[in-house]
Amino acid sequence: MILVLANSRDLPARRLVETWRAHDARLLTLADLSRAGWRHYVGEVGPEIAIACGELIPAASINGVITRIPWVTPEDLLHVVDGDRHYVAAEISAFLLAWLSQLTCPVINRPTTNGLMGAPHAAEGWMAIAARAGLRLPWTRRVFPAPPEPAWPPEAITVAVLGDRCFGNVDPALADQACRLAAAANVELLAVTFSHAAAGATFLGAQLWPDVSLPELAAALLARFVPAAGRAAANVAEAAA
C-alpha cells in the first residue's frame, strides 16, 4: 500500500492515486486524521494503525508515503468547530511529524521540525541554497507587498528532481544543477525553475510540489516504493541504452 498525504483539492495527488490504483494507493487527507482509530507509539510498544479513505491500515502494510502538505493550518480543518481549529491544527501537525518520522518505509520528502515536506524556504532562502550549490542567479529586486505570482519569462522551464534524477527537457548541465540544489536542500523530491532550457540559464526558484502525476516522474516514484516496479524500470532503462 502507498499513501499520498495531501489536501483533498490536490489534483496531481488525486491523479497519482488513480494511476497507482493497482498498487493499492490511497489518498490520506486531513479529514482522515480527524477520525478515531489511529494508533501511534513512541518507540516499539504496539502495532501502529493509520486511517486512509476511512479504513484502518496497519502501518506495517505501508510501502511508502508521499507528503504533499507542508503543515496543517486552521483553514485546512473546516470540518472542525471554528474555535478549536488553531489548537487542532497544531496537534495534528505535531502528530504527523512524529508519525512520519518513525515510519520505516520510504517517506518523500522526509519531515523536519520546520515542515512536514522537508525544510520549507522562502524565495530568498532558495536563492541562498542555490548560490551555495553553484547555480547561476539573476539580479533580483523585491517589492512589498509581493506579487501573487512570480514574473517569470515565458521561456522559463520547470524540472522535477527525484534523488539523483532530473525529469524535464533541459540541458544536462541544468539537470545536474537541479540535482545539486535538491541535495544541498536535503530533499529528495523538488521542482526547480530555470530562465530557459539551454546551458547558462539562471535559477529562478524552487518549490516542494512538483506535478507527481507526470508519467515519467510517477513511474520513478513508484519504483522507490514497489521493488517489482523498480526492477521493471531498470529493465526498460537498460533496454533503451
What name fits each language-model region?
Residues 1-3:
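Extreme N-terminal starter segment of soluble prokaryotic enzymes
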Residues 7-19, 30-137:
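Conserved N-proximal alpha/beta basic substrate-recognition cap immediately N-terminal to
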Residues 21-27:
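A generic structural motif
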Residues 25, 137-141:
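Short, well-structured beta-strand/strand-turn elements
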Residues 31, 70, 193-195, 207:
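Anionic group-transfer/hydrolysis microenvironments
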Residues 117, 147-148, 172, 209-214:
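A short local loop/turn or secondary-structure capping micro-motif enriched for an aromatic residue
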Residues 142-201:
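Phosphate-binding site of ATP-dependent enzymes
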Residues 187, 196-241:
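C-terminal active-site "lid" helix and adjoining low-complexity regulatory extension at the edge
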